[in-house]
Amino acid sequence: MLIETQYLSNSKKLVVSYIDKTGDIKLKYYDWDNPMKYVACDDNDPLRHPDFKSWDGKHVKQIEVAQPDRYATYEFLDSLSDKEKNEIFEFHVPKIYFIDIETEITDTSGFPEAADVKDSDGNVTKEGTTTQVLSISIVYDDKIILLGLKEMPEDMQDRIIKNTNKYFEKYNTNYKLKYIKYEDEFDMMYAFFNKMVPKMACLTGWNFLNYDWLYLVNRSRKLKKWVNGKEYVIDPRVSSLTKKLNKVWSTEFEIPAHRMIFDYMQLYEICDTTIKIKESSKLEFVSNKLIGLEKIKYNGSLQKLYEDDFETFMYYNAVDSVLVQKIHDAKNYISIIYAISSLSRIKITDVLSKAKNNLGTLAITEGVLRHRFKDQMNAIIFKDDEKEG
């Protein structure tokens, strides 16, 4: 299943990422010396294509470009051997990790902002990511990994996993828990970005893109640590196989190239047909409606819970990630995205418009029809590929 493509103009290569039969991400590199794109031209242009025209009957020609557009890239992929195409486009389910963070709360107004708040003139009115990440929960298959900054004795770990399995007992769960304690926030975030994310094919969570992932990326850029006279920083670009973060147009967040990151709340909003009246998109409401379970209740503030009852705090963090996993197990919205990508033979990053909160209908239509366009000698012309769906 095709994830993404990236043209490296310096080396004249096309990088293609896809999911292999093991559910992991693999990269292929193809030589592409002179990428071309179609543009409209005059009837008497000597370079006009002898056969192809635009959908509205205009003559077209191909010109050399530094960066190929989406259609040119798909045309290149379609020209590969059947063996190569099958390997890239064949449907395989990626390994998926459900993630949730908890942050320090020092403001009575609630959770800290995940990004700077700006006025209409671009001036920062409230700084984002001002407080530290206290814990991260990661759920994969039957494994729960908790990252934290406090000691957690074995008996506490035993109670947390016992209570978690009891809370989800109707699913006959048998989760195993691993807790990793870090010296400080820097070490935790460094390990997350440098050692964990590179092993994850697909990351998701609830309101994950607009909060958790955004907070993690922005916060990581603020952290520094001196060890033996040397300053260390965290570069969130290491989360990408090609060390590149792509800014998603009209949003605050950036997505690592060649890695799948989805917001399961967005998938629910787009794909769910079970709840006729969507009164809320909060996890508490949706999990109750879809799987009959809610978030863990606690008294007082979440910050107070962290300070006074670390065990319940980490239990709460773990359950939040498991709730999203169980919504996925029950509804599997993400399989719709996988199927569209595989059937239409387009990048999975083109299936969803993360900015507009809907399906990327234009890209999907192009994928479904592009072979018909070719048979009918029609070329697709892009005017501004940066702002496509």
What are the functions of these language-model segments?
Residues 3-9, 13-20, 25-44, 72-202, ...:
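Conserved RNase H-like, two-metal-ion catalytic cores of nucleic-acid enzymes
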Residues 54, 59, 93-97:
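Low-complexity, highly charged intrinsically disordered N-terminal segments
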Residues 98, 203-207, 212, 261-263, ...:
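A structural signal for short, well-ordered beta-strand segments and their strand-loop junctions
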Residues 101-105, 140-142, 209, 266-268, ...:
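Short, flexible loop/turn elements at secondary-structure junctions
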Residues 148-278:
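Conserved DEDDh/DEDDy metal-dependent 3′-5′ exonuclease domain
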Residues 190, 194-198, 210-221, 266, ...:
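A broad, structural surface signal
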Residues 271, 278-310:
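C-terminal or mid-to-C-terminal helical accessory/interaction module adjacent to the motor/catalytic core
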Residues 301-389:
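Common nucleic-acid-contacting/processivity interface regions adjacent to the catalytic cores
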